[in-house]
Amino acid sequence: VQEPRKWTAETPELYTLGLELSNPAGLQKDKIETVIGFKKTEIKDGVFYLNGIPLKVNAQNSHMQHPEEGHVMDEATIRKDFELLKQFNFNAVRTSHYPPVNKYLELANEYGLYIIDEVGDEAHASEWISSLPEYEEMYRERCRRMVLRDRNHPCVLFWSAGNESGEGINITHTIEEGKSLDPTRFWMYGGNAFSHPAEDIIGPRYPTPMELEMQVGIGEDSRPSFMDEYLSVAGNAGGALDDYWEAIYRHPRLIGGAIWDFVSPGLTERIRQVDDLSPFHTPAHLMGNARLVKEGKNTVLDLNGHDQWVEVYRADNVELNSNELTLTCRIYPRKLVSSCGSVSYT
């Protein structure tokens, strides 16, 4: 291909590569096909370029997590995720904190999403084994498996040497191993320090907009910067997004960042409803893993007071005119199959 159409998130141009195995007589014995793309990444004067153009990366972190199937995401779910990401103007995903299934990368090639592909060596900042020589080969082996499998996917923008696994020499070994197998891509590392000496693309993670401005925008480290995690959107968080991106657009060395995170990982649990026999009919649910226990001749509902409780949601049709509320509960264990009891207000 003399002048290939370049692959980007905006123009996901793909080509089919076919390989045939023939015997000396010219008879075909085997044939395989795969999809590839052409692109080129560079770092010049601290700026990250894709196909000769400075690139800004607006990413999300995402676990391989399904509410019904656990760590198994079917194609329909992946497509739904990618369509939502594209709809809201995200152009990248950091696969926290391990390589995704192969179908994930195939669809990223198709949809046009940059992937920051991550080695699965997380120690989550509690057991740092990256300085121990007996773990070096494990770091290298996990890196090899990822790079050898994924290096032909055009969606892989750059690699990550892992997440929160300390700052030891094994991180350097991981990056060395990866570069020996794929010299065309750059490396970052999701550590909790500002940067690691071996990475091509530095952090920080979770800076304030002012810290991002001071540490990177006018800092002395000349490497490009990517916030592999920032703006943790738990609960009602997510403020100051515009402040971050004003800094990112103001300084060419700032590539962008990956918001934590796209989908909160969790499994669907059965919620048992509690009937409100008062005139208010307020929604309430039995939460946790409360159990029925024998108490003398009776069977009662045991709530331990920590992770088991009856949760009563605020209802607009309930008006309280004082600082006191009396809650009366009447429990009928035989109804636990469909409803776990009754709640009445007095």
Specify the residue positions occupied by each region the protein language model found.
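Short, isolated positions in well-ordered beta-strands
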Residues: 29, 55, 279-284, 308
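Short beta-strand segments enriched in hydrophobic/aromatic residues
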Residues: 21, 119, 331-333
